Each structure stands twice: as structure tokens, then as C-alpha cells.
């Protein structure tokens, strides 16, 4: 664990979580602090919405407020963003790209070691394909297609076609703020999105369970 006290006078600290025992790491890091702000670098740890809420609970318990989360893990970025936190995805060359809900910027794609990062809405007729995981900051409109060898993660609405685990990986998953696809595929399984609207404030996740694709909220508690 590394702790970098950026401004102790104003109780602004930055910490890095390095192990699966991140909750205890965080408790030890903020011990002795009362009120202030904290920036968390969770590295490659895969944090769910439930995990992020636990981080917030621990910090709030001593009056600390999380101002941002940095990570190399796309799932953690989607989880933090879904809960309204500032999130920064670490790409190649130690560059952090801020995750925002404003998609008016020009589209751009960047390839990380195990991730294709795309910023911008995919429109009808457009195809985004990669052998690794794909993270999209924007909507996938009807008529657009996403094909990934790994997971598909969308900070936006999935209204087109998405295929995760295209080489047969049935452990792959598809996550979005709203899953209403024309077609959903994981490995060799096919499904359509539900008609019901998602619960407010919750991302949705599609996985294979008992040989069928199941869509459920990414629970925050």
C-alpha cells in the first residue's frame, strides 16, 4: 500500500489499493483522518458497484469524501461512473482519461494491453471490433455493432448489437447503463434485451447462467 499525503493541512490525500483486501487497506490508510477528500487509485482491482459503495461507506464513516477513482480496470471505471463518481481510466503510457457523461467530443479509440477504449457514440452502420475487452463511453445506437473477444462495457445505452466472448468465452459479460439491444450475444448464446426499464441509478449486466443469457441489475448494495 502506498499513501501520498498531498495536502495534510486540508486533509486531501491520495492512496493506492494493491490487494484483494482493499477494504482493510483503505481503513488503515485513512486512520487518524477526520473530514477531508480522498483520491483512490485501485490499480487493476475489479471493483463492482457494491465494492465502490463499500469504499464510500468506509470513507464517509470518518468524514472523508471520495473525489475520484483511478483504475486500469474497465469494470471498476464503469462501476464508479454508474454511481456518479469522477473516474479516470489509465491507458498506455500512464495516461489517465477522465470518464464523463458528456459525449459531444469527437469519437476516438485507444488500444490498451487488454482493452479497446472508444469515446463517442456508435451510430447505425458502424462496427467496433477487438480481440480484447471493449469499453465505450457513449451510446451504441440501433444498427451499430460491437464485437469483443472479452467483455463489452458501455458507459451509456446499448440499443444496437453486442457480442462478447466472440471466440467462445462463456465467462464474458456485457455491462451497460441500459441494456436494450436489438441482439445480445455471449459466446454462442443469443438473446434480446428486456422490455422493462432498468432500476434508476443501476447499471445492467448480461452473463451466461445455466446455458442461457441472463440480464440483471448490477446491484449497488
Curated annotation (Swiss-Prot):
**UniProt record, GO biological process:** cell morphogenesis; division septum assembly; regulation of cell septum assembly
Which of UniProt's keywords are assigned here?
Cell cycle, Cell division, Septation
Q: Does the keyword Cell division apply?
A: yes
Its function, per the record, reads: Cell division inhibitor that blocks the formation of polar Z ring septums. Rapidly oscillates between the poles of the cell to destabilize FtsZ filaments that have formed before they mature into polar Z rings. Prevents FtsZ polymerization.
Quaternary structure annotation from Swiss-Prot or TrEMBL: Interacts with MinD and FtsZ.
- Name the HAMAP family on file: MinC
Q: Which family does it belong to?
A: Belongs to the MinC family.
Q: What is this protein identified as?
A: Probable septum site-determining protein MinC
Amino acid at each position: 500500500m502506498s499513501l501520498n499525503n498531498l495536502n495534510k493541512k486540508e486533509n486531501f490525500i491520495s492512496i493506492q489499493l494493491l490487494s484483494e483486501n482493499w477494504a482493510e487497506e483503505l481503513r488503515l490508510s485513512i486512520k487518524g483522518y477526520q473530514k477531508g477528500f480522498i483520491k483512490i487509485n485501485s490499480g487493476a482491482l475489479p471493483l463492482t458497484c457494491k465494492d465502490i459503495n463499500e469504499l464510500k461507506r468506509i470513507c464517509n464513516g470518518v468524514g472523508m469524501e471520495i473525489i475520484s477513482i483511478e483504475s486500469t480496470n474497465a469494470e471498476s471505471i464503469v462501476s464508479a461512473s454508474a454511481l456518479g463518481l469522477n473516474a479516470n481510466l489509465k491507458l498506455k503510457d500512464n495516461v489517465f482519461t477522465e470518464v464523463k457523461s458528456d459525449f459531444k467530443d469527437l469519437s476516438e479509440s485507444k488500444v490498451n494491453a487488454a482493452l479497446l477504449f472508444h469515446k463517442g457514440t456508435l451510430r447505425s452502420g458502424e462496427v467496433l471490433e477487438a480481440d480484447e475487452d471493449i469499453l465505450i463511453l457513449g451510446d451504441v445506437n440501433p444498427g451499430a455493432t460491437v464485437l469483443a473477444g472479452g467483455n463489452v462495457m458501455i458507459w451509456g445505452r446499448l440499443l444496437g448489437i453486442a457480442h462478447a466472448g466472440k471466440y467462445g468465452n462463456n465467462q464474458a459479460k456485457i455491462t451497460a447503463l441500459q441494456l436494450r439491444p436489438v441482439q445480445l450475444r455471449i459466446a454462442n448464446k443469443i438473446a434480446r434485451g428486456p422490455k422493462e426499464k432498468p432500476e434508476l441509478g443501476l447499471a445492467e449486466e448480461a452473463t451466461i447462467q445455466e446455458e442461457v443469457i441472463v440480464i440483471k441489475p448490477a446491484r449497488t448494495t
